[in-house]
Amino acid sequence: MSSSKQPAGYHTVTPALVVRDANAAIDFYRRAFGASEGSRMAGPDGKIMHAEIRIGDSLIMLGEENEQWGTKSPLLTNGNPGSLHIYVDDADAAFDRALKAGATVKYPLEDAFWGDRYGKVADPFGHEWGLATRVKDLTDAEMKKAADEWMAKATAPA
């Protein structure tokens, strides 16, 4: 008997997404982010109540929105309170791949002040994904200076 408090392959924090049309979402995540599918479990109504995909070394659980279970997707609630962040070898290629798969731009790619080549896309299911490649490691002092400069520009009157 295992003494581990978490299943093999899981991390301490494992995201779980609620989507409308889990089959289409799994296909999108495969095309956009290179996800591989793990398990898939359907409920009595045939909708996916639990599925697992893997993007890189990270496991993500997902299931269909279902008001009876109290699970609502961002499409049902008309909003999304968070996002997922993926570090990739080439942010430009990953961004392009996601757009070709059907994602939309939320934040264009740029060389961000924190040292990443970074942009954000929204998937067709309402979830947002940050795509990044680390291009420069910064000290805490360099990070603070860069953040202060960025915020001064962002809040300056037009």
Map each language-model feature to its residues.
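Short acidic-aromatic low-complexity motifs
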Residues: V19-N23
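Vicinal oxygen chelate
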Residues: M1-A16, I26-D27, F33-P124, L131-A158
